[in-house]
Amino acid sequence: MGKLQMTPDLLRSLLQGTAEAVIAQAEHLTALDQAIGDGDHGINMKRGLENVLADLDNITAKPPAEALKAVGMTMVMKVGGASGPLYGTLAMTLGKEWPTDDELDSAKLGQMLAASIEALKKRGKADLGAKTMLDVLAPVQQALEANKSMAEISAIAKQAAEATIPMKATRGRASFLGDRSIGHMDPGACSSALMIQTICQLLEEKS
């Protein structure tokens, strides 16, 4: 990925596209969560992201760094469950790490995501291999540092979500199931992969 200047229109496109992609898969995400969690991941994510869409004009009127922080606050306040604080932390950390010149490349995105992963580890008291969204974000972060293409990163995110299926959950509600959590995709891994795939597709179309 070369240099990318984040404009208000591009930010709006990314936020809207990502929100709509997850909302469209809300029932699937809830079905995944019914197997190993509270059964509300899709419902909660849909509620939070519908609030983001409803406030999109105000959000995208802000500089990108502040816009991401606003998205994060909305996710914390509106999503509920475990996902709200986690996705809120992700968005707010990305906003905190955002470059002052609004110019992005793979290396900078990799640094921003690395900081977000560390923040998520602290917030969720989880690490890699615990069958969470971290198991998608970490390989994506490595792919960014390696300057992989958007198509490659999208495929890596999809594969990483699928790789949570044989894992045993050791964090969150799914961990109560022990070995019975094996054989199911983690809902948070699925939703984060879906977001990354959507962002990659939109950025590829813009390049």
Report each predicted region and the residues it spans.
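N-terminal loops that bind phosphate or other acidic moieties
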Residues: 1-207
